[in-house]
Structures are given as structure tokens and as C-alpha cells.
Design a protein with these regions (language model features):
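Short, charged phosphate-coordinating catalytic segments
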Residues: 118-122, 171-192, 295
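Charge-rich, intrinsically disordered N-terminal extensions
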Residues: 1-129, 156-159, 169-170
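Flexible interdomain linker/hinge and immediately adjacent N-terminus
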Residues: 7-24, 121-155, 199-206, 238-246
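Active-site-proximal segment of tyrosine recombinases
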Residues: 180-182, 274, 281-284, 291-303
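Basic, Lys/Arg- and aromatic-enriched nucleic-acid-binding interface segment
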Residues: 148-178, 280
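Active-site/catalytic core of tyrosine-dependent DNA strand-transfer enzymes
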Residues: 215-270
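Conserved tyrosine-mediated DNA breakage-rejoining catalytic core shared by Y-recombinases
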Residues: 184-221, 307
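Catalytic-site neighborhood detector that most strongly recognizes the C-terminal catalytic loop/helix
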Residues: 201-206, 301-332
């Protein structure tokens, strides 16, 4: 087990999670363990802690599968395409992972094996995966809340602590990942030539700056004032009473209590399902409705490229088709 705080190279980590350990004990093949340690140590210089833990999690699952199904395999040179095909069936049917999750893990494993193959000069493991193996969610669409669901949810935010309510409104208006909202710093807001900008430090990737409206800037400024008064020694805006950052699980705990106590329902009559990333998807769909180009949407969402933007456009088109179905059916009958 590695405690990353004790290494000479400490990767970027998410302060709201506080996860610093890497556990290699489940990898029982000696060569597998030695090589993956070497690879992940090199990644500590360039990748965030969350990415490194994801790589270890994906490799650990594969190593456990190989130990259980093919215990005779001790070296990377002995891994075959047939074994990979067995693993594809296993991860898609026996693990309970969603298509997005197992596709992500397969892509991570593919990249790791390719890197290991180049490191050890083992050509065969660089080509064990086919491009089609890691394409399970090409047709998957992001999920978004309807306008009515957002209104019902926001009306109940007054039941939360005011600062937590501000956090959730700001989260919706920024369209950020929840860890990026919860780790906003007090110096995030700036002004230039009468326009406001916010600096967002993405825990997964990088730092970027984007414009915000006067209304949102005023809400952020109020949250900063409250934070400075209640916790003068912290650099962050959104803090618990004990001065610690909110974790996403703690946030969900408070919000879910609010949902059940106030009987907040979705459009199908079920309890409102609070998913922080769905607000980001909703924000992305709203941007497509504003007729923005893909590059502008990607910049506002903090994406490095435009690869995922078509998913938001497809979701918007499917929602529009559903909303107009009754009218179109009636017109077809005329």
C-alpha cells in the first residue's frame, strides 16, 4: 500500500476526497504488480490522483480476473486475445458496471497494456484490444432535468442552509463538475472592463477562466462574504460548520433529506433523483438551445475538445421530438 503523501512525487489530488492511498495487495501476480507500480509511479508526475486510482482500479479488476480464470498466467507475454475476449464478457455481464463505467475501464486497461508493452518491448500486448472493444457508449446520451423538475427542486432549496443553497444554485449556473464547485476559492471572481470572470480549477484536468453574468457574480460574491465571516482562515468558499470542505457524499446526504422531507418529485411522480452531474448535462443542453457553436460550448463546460458536444445536441433533439410528438401525430392523422 502506498501513501502518496510520503512519496517524493505527490500527484494532484482532490481536497474534498482526501484519498492518498494506492492498494496493490489484490494483484497477486508478481510481475503484474511490479510493472504496474513502475507505470503508476511515473504517472504521478503528470496525472491527478483520481486518474491514477482509476487506472489501478481497472488493472486490479483485470489482474483478479486473470488470477481466478487463468492462474497459470504469470507474465504479460502469456496474455492472449482469447483471454481478453473472455474478460470483455465478464466485465460486461458479471460486474454490475454500467456501460459507461466498463467502457471507461476497458479504455484505461487498453492504454495501460499498450504502455506496458512499449515499456517491456512486448509487441503482442500492444494490440490485444480492438477499437470496437471500447466503444460501448457511443450511443449513450447524457441525462438532463426538465425545466419543471429544476423549478421544483430549486423552490425547496430554501430549506437548506443558505450557503449550501447558494452552492447548488451556483453549481447549476456554472455547469461545472461538483468537485470543481465545492472547491471554488475566494479569489475565483475577477472583473475586467466591466465584465465578470470566474477562475475554475478542475480537479481532474486543468485551470480555466470563463465569463459569468452580473447576477451570478453577485451570488458568488455573497457566498464569499459569508465564507470570510464564518471561516476567515480558509481559502475556500463552501465549508461545513467544522471548517472542512463538503464532500459530494455529505452534500447528497443533506439534499436527499430535503427531497424526502419536502416530497420533491420528478416528472414521473417518483422522488427527485439528485445527481450532481445531471445538472452539468442540463447546462450543456441549455447551451445547445442557445445556438452556440461546439467550440463555445466546450469552452464553457471546460472541455479540452468538442468530442462530447454532439451528445448534448442529440439529447436536445430527442427531447424536442418527444415534446412535439402529440402534435406531429395529430397532424399525421389530418
Amino acid at each position: 500500500v502506498w501513501d502518496m503523501r510520503k512519496l517524493d512525487i505527490v500527484p494532484r489530488s482532490n481536497p474534498i476526497r482526501g484519498r492518498y492511498r494506492l492498494d496493490f495487495r489484490e494483484i497477486r501476480q508478481k510481475e503484474f504488480k511490479e510493472i504496474i507500480k513502475k507505470i503508476l509511479y511515473s504517472h504521478c508526475q503528470t496525472k491527478a490522483m483520481g486518474s491514477i486510482k482509476g487506472e489501478l482500479r481497472g488493472f486490479r479488476r483485470f489482474a483478479s480476473f486473470m488470477y481466478d480464470r487463468f492462474p497459470e498466467v504469470k507474465h504479460f507475454t502469456e496474455i492472449s486475445r482469447d483471454m481478453i475476449e473472455d474478460y470483455l464478457v465478464y466485465i460486461k455481464t458479471d460486474t454490475g458496471l454500467t456501460s459507461v463505467s466498463y467502457t471507461t475501464e476497458l479504455s484505461v486497461l487498453d492504454n495501460l497494456l499498450d504502455e506496458i508493452g512499449r515499456e517491456l518491448e512486448i509487441e503482442n500486448i500492444c494490440n490485444l484490444f480492438l477499437s470496437s472493444d471500447c466503444r460501448a457508449y457511443d450511443n449513450a446520451l447524457p441525462e438532463a432535468y426538465s425545466d419543471a423538475e429544476i423549478r421544483r427542486f430549486n423552490c425547496a432549496l430554501t430549506k437548506l442552509k443558505p450557503q449550501l443553497g447558494r452552492c447548488l444554485i451556483i453549481h447549476q449556473m456554472l455547469g461545472t463538475r461538483i468537485e470543481d464547485t465545492l472547491t471554488l476559492r475566494r479569489d475565483c471572481l475577477s472583473e475586467k472592463s466591466g465584465h465578470y470572470f470566474i477562475t475554475i480549477i478542475q480537479q481532474k484536468t486543468r485551470k480555466y477562466k470563463r465569463p459569468v453574468s452580473n447576477q451570478l457574480a453577485e451570488l458568488i460574491r455573497k457566498a464569499i462574504e459569508v465564507s470570510e465571516k464564518e471561516h476567515p482562515d480558509s481559502e475556500y468558499i463552501f465549508l461545513q460548520d467544522n471548517g472542512k470542505l463538503y464532500t459530494d457524499s455529505m452534500l447528497k446526504y443533506h439534499v436527499n433529506i430535503m427531497i424526502y422531507e419536502n416530497d420533491i418529485r420528478d416528472d414521473n411522480g417518483n422522488y427527485f433523483e439528485f445527481r450532481t452531474h445531471r445538472f452539468r448535462h442540463t447546462f450543456g443542453v441549455k447551451l445547445t438551445e442557445m445556438k452556440l457553436d461546439d467550440d463555445s460550448i466546450a469552452r464553457l463546460l471546460g472541455h479540452k475538445d468538442t468530442r462530447t458536444i454532439p451528445h448534448y445536441r442529440r439529447l436536445r433533439n430527442e427531447a424536442l421530438a418527444e415534446d412535439t410528438k402529440a402534435v406531429r401525430d395529430e397532424m399525421n392523422e389530418l
